[in-house]
């Protein structure tokens, strides 16, 4: 795998890719790939040029993954942001990213306040009951035959910020080659395969949640269960209901789950990851 476009190409299109446990919505790899191609054409025909930055302020869900993969498919740079930021924080990160547009929900008041102050276009992400994502925003229209040229390994795919614990947060660019190398290594190390089901408990704006838990599973052709947030109370019921074989999290989450293990009648998983990537 050389770019994030390759993430979906090798996978059986009939295989289940993402399940949202809150409402039971499930999409396969074929649907995911088709949506990304269609929406990538829409983005590029809106007037954006390769290498420009698309900020993403969305909660965990199908919408987030489609938005992220769409941006990178269109040779744009995805810049994830914590969707719970206040308007002041959004404004700082949007300016620092030099974002050209923002993808968010219809009810994201703080990010919309920041975009108004910066005169940035907003694209609203939504989906229907079958998992089809729509991106509504300014610009032209296009069909899948207008799919833009694929990215190359040296293109920047992702902009993330350091935590800022020792000073001002700094933007950290990652190329398609950087991201795919990490994804391939993680999938190989944990021997992930289409037989696996992963439970995503980390936020997707976090490198660990996006790269370590999610993209690595998709590269392996595995299925992911994607709740909108981590819930210790819901963890083991989800594991049992969906035959989860692995998850990846920071140590704090492991500690929370271990503390509840006896009372929750905890089962065992085949694999688990402890290292945070960002």
Spell out what each predicted region is:
Residues 26-30, 157-181:
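Conserved AMP-binding A3 loop
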